[in-house]
Swiss-Prot record:
Organism, scientific name: Novosphingobium aromaticivorans (strain ATCC 700278 / DSM 12444 / CCUG 56034 / CIP 105152 / NBRC 16084 / F199)
Residue numbers binding (6S)-5,6,7,8-tetrahydrofolate: 109-112
Family matches, as InterPro entries: Fmt, Formyl_trans_C, Formyl_transf_N, Formyl_transf_N_sf, Formyl_transferase-like_C_sf, Met-tRNA-FMT_C, Met-tRNA-FMT_N
Protein known as: Methionyl-tRNA formyltransferase
Top-level division of the source organism's lineage: Bacteria
Length: 301
Protein backbone atom coordinates (compact mmCIF):
# COMPACT_ATOMS: atom_id res chain seq x y z
CA UNK A 1 0.00 0.00 0.00
CA UNK A 2 0.95 3.64 -0.45
CA UNK A 3 0.98 4.96 3.10
CA UNK A 4 1.34 8.36 4.70
CA UNK A 5 2.67 7.90 8.23
CA UNK A 6 1.93 10.47 10.93
CA UNK A 7 3.61 10.28 14.33
CA UNK A 8 6.04 12.03 16.64
CA UNK A 9 7.39 10.29 19.81
CA UNK A 10 9.17 7.00 20.47
CA UNK A 11 5.78 5.26 20.80
CA UNK A 12 5.20 5.77 17.06
CA UNK A 13 8.56 4.53 15.77
CA UNK A 14 7.87 0.75 15.95
CA UNK A 15 4.78 1.22 13.77
CA UNK A 16 6.77 3.11 11.14
CA UNK A 17 9.50 0.46 11.22
CA UNK A 18 6.93 -2.35 10.96
CA UNK A 19 5.27 -0.76 7.92
CA UNK A 20 8.62 -0.46 6.15
CA UNK A 21 9.58 -4.04 7.09
CA UNK A 22 6.25 -5.31 5.76
CA UNK A 23 7.04 -3.87 2.34
CA UNK A 24 4.59 -0.98 2.33
CA UNK A 25 5.46 2.12 0.32
CA UNK A 26 5.64 4.85 2.95
CA UNK A 27 5.46 7.87 0.66
CA UNK A 28 5.71 10.50 3.40
CA UNK A 29 6.12 10.85 7.14
CA UNK A 30 4.49 13.72 8.99
CA UNK A 31 5.84 14.67 12.40
CA UNK A 32 5.75 17.64 14.72
CA UNK A 33 8.45 20.27 14.11
CA UNK A 34 11.85 20.02 15.80
CA UNK A 35 11.82 21.26 19.40
CA UNK A 36 14.55 22.85 21.54
CA UNK A 37 16.15 20.18 23.74
CA UNK A 38 19.14 19.69 26.02
CA UNK A 39 21.20 22.28 27.84
CA UNK A 40 21.95 24.18 24.65
CA UNK A 41 18.29 24.19 23.61
CA UNK A 42 19.32 23.07 20.14
CA UNK A 43 16.46 22.13 17.83
CA UNK A 44 16.01 18.36 17.95
CA UNK A 45 13.98 16.41 15.36
CA UNK A 46 11.40 13.98 16.75
CA UNK A 47 12.11 10.24 16.99
CA UNK A 48 9.78 9.62 14.02
CA UNK A 49 11.53 12.33 12.00
CA UNK A 50 14.91 10.67 12.57
CA UNK A 51 13.59 7.16 11.85
CA UNK A 52 11.92 8.28 8.62
CA UNK A 53 15.05 10.05 7.41
CA UNK A 54 17.05 6.88 8.07
CA UNK A 55 14.77 5.09 5.60
CA UNK A 56 14.95 7.89 3.03
CA UNK A 57 11.29 8.81 3.56
CA UNK A 58 10.13 12.33 2.74
CA UNK A 59 9.53 14.10 6.09
CA UNK A 60 7.13 16.98 6.55
CA UNK A 61 6.84 18.96 9.80
CA UNK A 62 3.99 21.48 9.49
CA UNK A 63 2.85 23.33 12.59
CA UNK A 64 -0.73 22.82 11.43
CA UNK A 65 -2.70 20.92 8.80
CA UNK A 66 -5.52 23.44 8.65
CA UNK A 67 -4.14 25.41 5.70
CA UNK A 68 -5.20 24.70 2.13
CA UNK A 69 -1.59 24.45 0.89
CA UNK A 70 -0.67 21.72 3.38
CA UNK A 71 -3.87 19.83 2.61
CA UNK A 72 -3.18 20.01 -1.13
CA UNK A 73 0.37 18.74 -0.58
CA UNK A 74 -0.87 15.84 1.52
CA UNK A 75 -3.54 14.87 -1.01
CA UNK A 76 -0.94 14.90 -3.79
CA UNK A 77 0.83 11.93 -2.20
CA UNK A 78 -2.14 9.89 -3.47
CA UNK A 79 -2.02 7.53 -0.49
CA UNK A 80 -4.17 4.47 0.04
CA UNK A 81 -4.23 5.08 3.79
CA UNK A 82 -2.72 7.27 6.48
CA UNK A 83 -1.43 5.49 9.58
CA UNK A 84 -1.38 7.70 12.67
CA UNK A 85 0.38 7.02 15.99
CA UNK A 86 0.67 9.77 18.62
CA UNK A 87 1.06 12.51 16.01
CA UNK A 88 -0.12 15.33 18.25
CA UNK A 89 -1.86 17.52 15.67
CA UNK A 90 -5.58 17.76 14.93
CA UNK A 91 -6.49 16.29 11.54
CA UNK A 92 -9.10 18.39 9.70
CA UNK A 93 -11.81 16.59 7.74
CA UNK A 94 -10.01 17.29 4.46
CA UNK A 95 -6.99 15.36 5.76
CA UNK A 96 -9.12 12.51 7.12
CA UNK A 97 -10.77 12.18 3.71
CA UNK A 98 -7.64 12.47 1.55
CA UNK A 99 -6.36 8.85 1.62
CA UNK A 100 -8.51 6.36 -0.27
CA UNK A 101 -9.11 4.27 2.87
CA UNK A 102 -9.02 7.15 5.33
CA UNK A 103 -6.82 7.37 8.43
CA UNK A 104 -6.14 4.51 10.86
CA UNK A 105 -4.89 5.26 14.36
CA UNK A 106 -2.81 3.21 16.81
CA UNK A 107 -4.19 4.21 20.22
CA UNK A 108 -2.63 3.05 23.49
CA UNK A 109 -5.74 1.94 25.36
CA UNK A 110 -8.73 -0.37 25.13
CA UNK A 111 -11.22 2.11 23.71
CA UNK A 112 -13.60 3.57 24.67
CA UNK A 113 -11.67 3.67 27.95
CA UNK A 114 -9.03 6.39 28.07
CA UNK A 115 -9.66 8.45 24.98
CA UNK A 116 -7.19 11.29 24.79
CA UNK A 117 -3.58 12.29 25.22
CA UNK A 118 -2.28 10.22 28.16
CA UNK A 119 -3.94 6.79 28.15
CA UNK A 120 -1.01 4.86 29.60
CA UNK A 121 -0.46 7.17 32.56
CA UNK A 122 -4.19 7.38 33.32
CA UNK A 123 -4.57 3.60 33.23
CA UNK A 124 -1.76 3.21 35.78
CA UNK A 125 -3.07 5.99 38.03
CA UNK A 126 -6.55 4.43 38.02
CA UNK A 127 -5.19 1.03 39.00
CA UNK A 128 -6.43 -0.69 35.84
CA UNK A 129 -5.49 -4.36 35.74
CA UNK A 130 -5.58 -4.54 31.93
CA UNK A 131 -4.89 -2.11 29.13
CA UNK A 132 -3.96 -2.54 25.48
CA UNK A 133 -3.95 -1.10 21.99
CA UNK A 134 -6.83 -0.28 19.67
CA UNK A 135 -6.67 0.19 15.90
CA UNK A 136 -9.43 2.63 14.97
CA UNK A 137 -10.75 4.48 11.94
CA UNK A 138 -10.27 8.16 12.65
CA UNK A 139 -13.05 10.73 12.57
CA UNK A 140 -13.37 14.31 13.79
CA UNK A 141 -14.12 13.37 17.42
CA UNK A 142 -11.37 12.71 19.97
CA UNK A 143 -10.64 8.97 19.61
CA UNK A 144 -14.33 8.29 18.91
CA UNK A 145 -14.00 6.42 15.63
CA UNK A 146 -15.02 2.82 14.97
CA UNK A 147 -12.62 0.09 16.08
CA UNK A 148 -11.04 -2.46 13.76
CA UNK A 149 -8.96 -4.48 16.24
CA UNK A 150 -7.79 -4.53 19.86
CA UNK A 151 -5.18 -6.43 21.82
CA UNK A 152 -4.91 -6.60 25.62
CA UNK A 153 -1.97 -6.69 27.99
CA UNK A 154 -1.80 -6.71 31.82
CA UNK A 155 -0.52 -3.60 33.58
CA UNK A 156 1.24 -5.81 36.17
CA UNK A 157 3.09 -3.10 38.11
CA UNK A 158 4.80 -1.72 35.00
CA UNK A 159 6.02 1.86 34.74
CA UNK A 160 4.61 4.18 32.10
CA UNK A 161 7.87 3.88 30.20
CA UNK A 162 7.82 0.08 30.17
CA UNK A 163 4.13 -0.13 29.34
CA UNK A 164 4.38 2.46 26.56
CA UNK A 165 7.24 0.55 24.94
CA UNK A 166 5.30 -2.72 25.15
CA UNK A 167 2.15 -1.20 23.67
CA UNK A 168 4.16 0.42 20.89
CA UNK A 169 5.46 -2.96 19.74
CA UNK A 170 2.07 -4.66 20.07
CA UNK A 171 0.35 -1.82 18.24
CA UNK A 172 2.85 -1.93 15.40
CA UNK A 173 2.31 -5.65 14.86
CA UNK A 174 -1.46 -5.26 15.05
CA UNK A 175 -1.50 -2.45 12.50
CA UNK A 176 0.51 -4.52 10.01
CA UNK A 177 -1.86 -7.44 10.61
CA UNK A 178 -4.92 -5.27 9.96
CA UNK A 179 -3.49 -3.72 6.78
CA UNK A 180 -2.64 -7.17 5.42
CA UNK A 181 -6.31 -8.18 5.40
CA UNK A 182 -8.59 -5.18 5.95
CA UNK A 183 -11.67 -7.10 4.87
CA UNK A 184 -11.30 -9.36 7.91
CA UNK A 185 -11.50 -6.40 10.31
CA UNK A 186 -14.92 -4.78 10.01
CA UNK A 187 -15.26 -1.48 11.85
CA UNK A 188 -17.20 -1.72 15.12
CA UNK A 189 -18.79 1.39 16.59
CA UNK A 190 -17.47 2.20 20.06
CA UNK A 191 -19.99 1.55 22.84
CA UNK A 192 -21.35 4.56 24.70
CA UNK A 193 -20.80 2.89 28.05
CA UNK A 194 -17.35 2.84 29.59
CA UNK A 195 -16.07 6.07 28.05
CA UNK A 196 -13.30 7.77 30.05
CA UNK A 197 -10.91 10.56 29.10
CA UNK A 198 -7.13 10.52 29.50
CA UNK A 199 -6.47 14.20 29.98
CA UNK A 200 -3.00 15.51 29.22
CA UNK A 201 -0.58 15.18 32.13
CA UNK A 202 0.02 18.38 34.08
CA UNK A 203 3.52 18.52 35.59
CA UNK A 204 1.95 19.58 38.89
CA UNK A 205 0.47 16.07 39.13
CA UNK A 206 3.95 14.60 39.50
CA UNK A 207 4.49 16.04 43.00
CA UNK A 208 3.99 13.08 45.34
CA UNK A 209 0.91 13.39 47.53
CA UNK A 210 1.72 11.50 50.71
CA UNK A 211 -1.74 12.12 52.16
CA UNK A 212 -3.06 9.44 49.81
CA UNK A 213 -3.01 5.69 50.30
CA UNK A 214 0.45 4.17 49.75
CA UNK A 215 -0.91 2.04 46.90
CA UNK A 216 -2.04 5.19 45.10
CA UNK A 217 1.28 6.91 45.75
CA UNK A 218 3.18 3.95 44.27
CA UNK A 219 0.93 4.14 41.19
CA UNK A 220 1.78 7.82 40.94
CA UNK A 221 5.46 6.86 40.90
CA UNK A 222 4.96 4.33 38.10
CA UNK A 223 2.68 6.60 36.06
CA UNK A 224 5.34 9.31 35.88
CA UNK A 225 8.40 7.07 35.45
CA UNK A 226 10.67 7.81 33.71
CA UNK A 227 9.23 11.22 32.78
CA UNK A 228 8.43 13.71 34.14
CA UNK A 229 9.26 11.75 37.31
CA UNK A 230 7.21 11.81 40.50
CA UNK A 231 9.06 13.85 43.10
CA UNK A 232 9.31 15.21 46.61
CA UNK A 233 11.40 18.10 47.90
CA UNK A 234 13.76 18.25 50.86
CA UNK A 235 15.48 21.47 51.91
CA UNK A 236 14.74 23.02 48.53
CA UNK A 237 16.16 20.12 46.50
CA UNK A 238 13.98 17.97 44.26
CA UNK A 239 14.24 14.17 44.39
CA UNK A 240 12.66 12.21 41.54
CA UNK A 241 11.31 8.81 42.58
CA UNK A 242 11.44 6.39 39.64
CA UNK A 243 10.43 3.20 41.50
CA UNK A 244 9.06 2.44 44.95
CA UNK A 245 7.66 -0.33 47.12
CA UNK A 246 4.60 -0.29 49.38
CA UNK A 247 5.12 -0.96 53.09
CA UNK A 248 2.61 -1.85 55.78
CA UNK A 249 3.81 0.66 58.37
CA UNK A 250 2.10 3.78 59.68
CA UNK A 251 3.12 7.31 60.52
CA UNK A 252 2.45 10.95 59.81
CA UNK A 253 1.96 11.46 56.04
CA UNK A 254 5.07 12.85 54.38
CA UNK A 255 7.37 12.06 57.30
CA UNK A 256 10.05 9.35 57.20
CA UNK A 257 9.47 6.56 59.70
CA UNK A 258 13.01 5.13 59.69
CA UNK A 259 16.54 5.87 58.51
CA UNK A 260 16.19 4.01 55.19
CA UNK A 261 13.60 6.32 53.60
CA UNK A 262 10.29 4.67 54.41
CA UNK A 263 7.83 7.55 53.93
CA UNK A 264 4.46 7.44 55.67
CA UNK A 265 1.36 7.97 53.56
CA UNK A 266 -2.33 8.45 54.37
CA UNK A 267 -2.47 4.69 54.78
CA UNK A 268 0.72 2.61 54.82
CA UNK A 269 4.05 3.87 53.53
CA UNK A 270 6.32 3.72 50.51
CA UNK A 271 10.06 3.31 50.18
CA UNK A 272 11.73 4.59 47.00
CA UNK A 273 13.90 1.92 45.39
CA UNK A 274 15.23 4.05 42.51
CA UNK A 275 15.75 7.75 43.07
CA UNK A 276 17.43 10.68 41.33
CA UNK A 277 18.74 13.95 42.73
CA UNK A 278 18.77 17.03 40.53
CA UNK A 279 21.59 16.92 37.98
CA UNK A 280 22.72 13.42 38.98
CA UNK A 281 22.14 9.90 37.64
CA UNK A 282 19.44 7.68 39.09
CA UNK A 283 20.59 5.36 41.88
CA UNK A 284 19.22 2.85 44.34
CA UNK A 285 18.13 4.25 47.67
CA UNK A 286 20.97 2.64 49.63
CA UNK A 287 23.50 4.44 47.41
CA UNK A 288 21.67 7.72 47.89
CA UNK A 289 21.65 7.39 51.67
CA UNK A 290 25.38 6.65 51.81
CA UNK A 291 25.98 10.16 50.49
CA UNK A 292 22.98 11.97 51.91
CA UNK A 293 21.49 10.78 55.21
CA UNK A 294 17.74 11.28 55.63
CA UNK A 295 16.94 10.25 59.22
CA UNK A 296 13.61 9.11 60.56
CA UNK A 297 11.30 11.99 61.43
CA UNK A 298 12.30 14.05 58.38
CA UNK A 299 9.39 15.87 56.72
CA UNK A 300 9.32 15.74 52.92
CA UNK A 301 7.41 18.19 50.74
Amino acid sequence: MRIIFMGTPDFAVPTLEALVAAGHDVVAAYSQPPRPAGRGKKLQPSPVHLAAEAHGIDVRTPVSLKGADEQTTLAAFDADVAVVAAYGLILPQAVLDAPRLGCLNVHGSLLPRWRGAAPVQRAILAGDEMTGVTIMQMERGLDTGPMLARIETPVDGKTAGDLTAELAVKGAALMVQVLADLASYPAVVQPEQGVTYAHKIDKAESRLDFTRDAVDVERQVRAFSPAPGAFFELEGERYRVLAAEVLGVAGEPGVTVDDVLAIACGTGAIRPTLIQRAGRPAMDTASLLRGRAIPGGTRLG
